[in-house]
């Protein structure tokens, strides 16, 4: 309380004119920087990207705070002490840039005619009348009023509001005009596909395809509405309001075209609703109309798309698929089917207030929602067709395969063991931890203090044939040790993957490990649950083949003798005896075809080099993905996600990246010290001298941003004396940079070519040993350099530092300056590439798709070893076409001209072996370098004369 009173008293204290000007100028510098970043995000980045939207919201709230601070500083100065310079703050032109007012309007308004303070004192109608005189349209007036309303609230509160109140609530439609979404005359192809495959789901009468008619001046926000279960089929009660935890945020001004653009998915305001059931009676009384029945947790899994009872922002668009159970009298038999009436909530016909809708549902999120729901599979709960049931009734057995049975839950205790991680997240509280506990059964990781709130262990009791006989099995598949198939964590099943931190898990929530997670196809119900065996499939249904069969499971092969037709692609829960593993087929290396250089080919623009590349097999792709994903944090199987065609984000990746994120405003960029394919390198300061590498990647490309984050994840775990020290990264587009320690000395490329420096055998061996140490460490961490050369190695007084490892994946996805029929080759790059990479070069093959491996890094080290003794690159005087042909066929330069010894040339030939399996590892290379004969001192050294005199 004392601190709050002190801050309030300081805010009320008057300021002198000089101090107020200093504070306003300081805040104005921050405003200029933030506005430039905001305009860059709005114009150069994709508006549909979630990361871009979040950054835009953050910058807008910061700017509101900055303008409020300028108003407060100006208010503390007495009126008689103010001068013209102070009256110029805050600047109206900068506020109009935030609102995205056209330049024509800005040029018409002069600072003497209108100020921001004048607009704050006006009403909305007066603001519109004033701005329309200068040529502003109604849409700009609506945005200006929304921004001024937010600034008034923040300024009146003195900045004590929450961060959510700083966000400007932008309107999405022009005031004064009615926005009636276009209603299609018939359902979309997506809906027709689902209706044709579901026998009892029919479209309603055309009057339900009615558009919403908002009142003039009210912004219309579209959202996928909820489903309700009603006792009367003709009533459309308004949906309940959203909880306070889900705050609706309208889009930014630059993102309004996304809302207006008609999506390729079905229109949001289209309603497809199965007809309702007859009114239900309970105790001879009808339920009052318009009263929604209470929800039931047991029936929530009947609807495709719901897997567990969790609440997260990433599943907010699935609120339209909720089904509530009516209060029916208790049945004597549990097998009696339940009658449900399902109201489709995709654009309900009633008028919903704007504050209850969420306009941030972009076209991409809606498209993923519709595409993710595939057609109803034959294993959907059967629909009864008896005469006593209405044609508009959907009957579902009580024990559907999608319903978890609570009576089979148990309270098995965890088998915890103490563990240590470099960086890990607690499953219960969502906070980071170094020391903690890990369950041996379900692999749950949490703090010691969180064990009391941890959910029960993931063990289930499964009925098998005779209900009296129970078989206990673990929830993880038997091939858990397979590096390609990693077990799913508890957070993957029940916690949203898009949130960096999650709240504590509800104790009453029963974990359902066998239910499909949020990334699986929600409309498929073919995965068998412990409560019921898999339903039989009709002969016409052709199930997909298993992804990764593992026949080495004797226990599960004995317990589960299910046909292979029920094996689906959710999770490998059961192993079936009739699944035969697919043998691996060796791939054939492509052939290099070198066309003769003629004038015709050059004039026609045809490529001088043509390389036939065969696609790699799926086994190699999965093996490469397994190597990349071997990190401290556990990820979902990448091959399984690609088979599902459903995007997914790892929650812990964002948490790890936050630890190394450095705001771009904190960096002091100095002079340019280097430039390469990855961008420019500047000498800068961030708590000392650092090297700032600005990554020059294309904008509006998710693949490049993901590749950059993957390399940052690889950088963060490197700590070695021969590897450059990673200090952090700027990961807020459009500013992407990697901050490392400043390397002293010169590059090995310049040292080798300096004739004044003597490189004898002892010095070259010492340099090579330092490089081998650093590369061996990177390979032990699972990191490939992919661009090892003398220009990426720094040498200073016998110390070697390796830089730029892993950045080749970022440069590989660059398309700037790339031509369709040209292969970009930098000087000195080809002699560092292994033959298997040379043979894959093609104008059509992207650089990040080249088959880099640990063996290719060893080949590049051989080129550096050659350069240390020859003081030049191999094949330097030859053209690129000749180098590609010679190195692709395994030819080597003439070593007799250099005068290498036998031991030195043997190391070079081992590194340059044509077959990559014959190349040694860096551990073996260290042994070979240590066995090199050391050069003794000359006999004319004074030490020898001293020894001879003693004799």
UniProtKB/Swiss-Prot annotation:
InterPro entries: C1-like_sf, Kinase-like_dom_sf, KSR_SAM-like_dom, PE/DAG-bd, Prot_kinase_dom, SAM/pointed_sf, SAM_KSR1_N, SAM_KSR1_N_sf. The modification Phosphoserine is found at residue 475. GO terms for molecular function: ATP binding; MAP-kinase scaffold activity; mitogen-activated protein kinase kinase binding; protein serine kinase activity; protein serine/threonine kinase activity; zinc ion binding. It is an enzyme of class 2 (transferase). It catalyses: L-seryl-[protein] + ATP = O-phospho-L-seryl-[protein] + ADP + H(+); L-threonyl-[protein] + ATP = O-phospho-L-threonyl-[protein] + ADP + H(+). The protein kinase domain is predicted to be catalytically inactive and seems to have very low intrinsic kinase activity. This low kinase activity can be increased by interaction with BRAF. This is Kinase suppressor of Ras 2. The gene is Ksr2.
